[in-house]
Amino acid sequence: MAMSPAVRNSVIAAISGGAIAIASVLITGPGGNDGLEGVRYKPYKDVVGVLTVCYGHTGKDIMPGKTYTEAECKALLNKDLATVARQINPYIKVDIPETTRGGIYSFVYNVGAGNFETSTLLRKINQVDIKGACDQLRRWTYAGGKQWKGLMTRREIEREVCLWGQQ
């Protein structure tokens, strides 16, 4: 599934804001609830049983039974993306386009920094094989041992944005 024109236009508009802004638009979508994560204001268990809220936020700070506001969800996402940036930027040893970095932030937000740090994707980035790195996103479509169509779609969109800097 290709990226919708609305998401594409929102990502293009976010480019001047940098990689975190790009990742945020990918995750939330142009309408705030039509992105790669969607939004749920009440905590729930994801497909692998992890307590989750808002745009995919996980952690001990989630209050079961609480209904989160849109502002609280956006604040959690901004905090989480800043954490992603702090966690993975030291491992990226070469200059990469902000669009590539934004696609990677969205990916790492979904799979976790630990998985990124040991990935072929990171190795390819540091070898300045940006296309090869972006192509690696297609390998990350499983959760709980099962391949998910939603993850396949997400990775194609992240890959497309990741490759924008190559065009």
From Swiss-Prot:
Q: Name one GO cellular component term.
A: membrane
Which residues carry out catalysis? E37 (proton donor/acceptor), D46 (proton donor/acceptor)
In the bilayer, the protein is annotated as: Single-pass type II membrane protein
Q: What class of enzyme is it?
A: hydrolase
UniProt key word Glycoprotein:
no
What name does UniProt use for this protein? SAR-endolysin
The protein's job, in short, is:
Signal-arrest-release (SAR) endolysin with lysozyme activity that degrades host peptidoglycans and participates with the pinholin and spanin proteins in the sequential events which lead to programmed host cell lysis releasing the mature viral particles. Once the pinholin has permeabilized the host cell membrane, the SAR-endolysin is released into the periplasm where it breaks down the peptidoglycan layer.
Cite a single Pfam family from the UniProt record.
Phage_lysozyme
An MF annotation (GO) of this entry: lysozyme activity
State the Gene Ontology BP annotations: cell wall macromolecule catabolic process; defense response to bacterium; killing of cells of another organism; peptidoglycan catabolic process
Please list the reactions this protein catalyses: Hydrolysis of (1->4)-beta-linkages between N-acetylmuramic acid and N-acetyl-D-glucosamine residues in a peptidoglycan and between N-acetyl-D-glucosamine residues in chitodextrins
- Domain comment? The signal-anchor, which may also be an uncleaved signal sequence tethers the SAR-endolysin to the membrane until the latter is depolarized by the holin, resulting in the escape of SAR-endolysin from the membrane.
Taxonomy, superkingdom:
Viruses
- Family membership noted in the UniProt record: Belongs to the glycosyl hydrolase 24 family.
EC number, UniProt record: 3.2.1.17
Q: Which UniProt keywords apply?
A: Antimicrobial, Bacteriolytic enzyme, Cytolysis, Glycosidase, Host cell inner membrane, Host cell lysis by virus, Host cell membrane, Host membrane, Hydrolase, Membrane, Signal-anchor, Transmembrane, Transmembrane helix, Viral release from host cell
Q: What is its main location?
A: host cell
